[in-house]
Amino acid sequence: RDMRRLILLTLYLLLGARLPLVGQGELIVMSYNVENLFDLEDHPERADDEFLPEGSHRWTKARYERKLHQIAEVLSSAGSLTHFPDLVALVEVENAGVLRDLLSHTPLGAQAGYAFTVTEGEDPRGINVALLYRTETFRLLGRRELSLHFPFDSAKRTRPILEVSGLVPSGDTLHLYVCHLPSRRGGARQSERYRRYACEQLRELTTRRLEGSAGHTHVLVLGDFNGAPEEPATREALGSRPYLESGGGTHPPRDTLHAELYELTPRRGEGAPPGTYCFRGVWTQLDQIHASRSLLGGGRLSYVEGSAEIFYRPFMGQPSVSSPFPVPFRTYGGAFWRGGYSDHYPLRIRLRYERP
């Protein structure tokens, strides 16, 4: 089984990204919390001691290289028959160095055509967010980091929001906001105000981007929200509503969509994970993708109905006594190395475009 997967992966890497472009196509967008992708170096200004060769997690070169290839395997598996995922939001990466290694130590760099941008935030552990993008289908226009400073807690330090803007093949402008909202440490209710504040900032940013746009400017907010989509931080502060898809692949009437942002709810059912994260048998949709209303109207760039899914392949999970569905195959359980991919499953959507 492993050899067959390796052969298919090699053929895909050699051929998949080289098919000709046509006037119509699709972009694959992913969001993936990769669980603590640290390098092997000690950064004294950050609390990264656990992830050093002599640290509590025994983070060795062999384990690091294995992790890089596992991430590459997931991304390669999530591509289509014609190309790799076009835009990949990565959560829990330490710095630009690990992304350079991801592209240079695995087949991704030679075949996928990725470039990247990553934050350099104030998180105490040095955790950041990043975006991989295929330069063939996303022309970078600009990027900036948006630091979160809480007026009610000036000492709190967390990950910034990454805003990336680019042109897609339709000629439309797509703004992506990659986020890793404050954790639930200290309790969900006690920490909720931090996530609410972050969502308020996101709402202000996205509203400003969409104001006065002529329908060819779009927004995606994606990443790890450290909370379910129905929680107040998302529903109230971000102002995002669940997108109820119509049957038959047709878009709901535009005048029925009143919010600016909609959560693209992943498909549920047999063979689909109940959530992206499982803790003691309880599944949660911590990872989310929210789209602007402009992507739901059937324009030159539009969301493909029914394409939102929790991306899962059997090699990414493992059996658990606490869940009837395989749970994510983690890299670590506490300080114990399990050798898996991540403690999250990624999300994947498709956007259809028409060239002008």
What does each of the following model-derived ranges do?
Residues 35, 94, 182, 225-228, ...:
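Catalytic metal-binding/acid-base residues of hydrolase active sites
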Residues 8-18:
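Bacterial N-terminal signal peptides
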Residues 93-173, 177-181:
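Structured beta-strand-rich core segments of catalytic domains in phosphoester-bond hydrolases
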Residues 53-64, 84-91, 118-119, 150-151, ...:
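Second-shell loop/turn segments in exported
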Residues 21-111, 117-129, 200, 317-325, ...:
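N-terminal, active-site-proximal structural segment of metallo-dependent hydrolase catalytic domains
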Residues 206-220, 227-356:
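Metal-dependent phosphoester-hydrolase catalytic domains
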Residues 45-48, 172, 177-191:
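Active-site His/acidic residue clusters
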Residues 192-214:
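A long, amphipathic alpha-helix that forms part
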